[in-house]
A protein has these predicted regions:
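Non-catalytic interface/targeting segments
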Residues: 1-50, 54, 61-62, 81-83, ...
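Conserved residues at the C-terminal ends of beta-strands
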Residues: 70
Length: 120
């Protein structure tokens, strides 16, 4: 499974970023091969609007099967869900720890957006 995880640094020990659309970057980790790649999210960090939708589309284009973030807004949630991408919530853990938790089935899957649009 390809997992996209929000992060605040280009480091697997980085905490999962609580923001989705305005996260500083993402790791795409393959849970089967163990490979990972960092993708900066520079174009959306300071976006006036549409950061969640643009970030969601980038993650869909990268072929992710799941997303792990602290929070997810309504428009991004709708787009990711429509594309079949599962969304999981993780707070207070490192990216590498979140990967292990999702593999173990211990991360909660979100059933709806948990913040309003334009949450910063």
């Amino acid at each position: 499974m390809k997992i996209a995880l929000t992060c605040s640094e280009n480091n697997l020990g980085s905490p999962v970023d609580p923001r989705f659309g305005r996260a500083k970057g993402f790791f795409i980790c393959d849970s089967e091969s163990g490979e990972s790649a960092y993708y900066p999210n520079v174009q959306n960090v300071g976006a006036v609007q549409g950061a969640g939708i643009q970030t969601a589309q980038n993650i869909i284009n990268a072929g992710a099967d799941a997303v792990v973030s602290g929070h997810c807004g309504p428009k991004a949630f709708k787009l990711l869900s429509a594309a079949g991408v599962k969304i999981f919530s993780a707070a207070d853990c490192a990216v590498s720890e979140a990967v292990e938790k999702i593999k173990a089935g211990s991360l909660p899957e979100m059933s709806a957006a948990d913040v309003e649009g334009h949450w910063v």
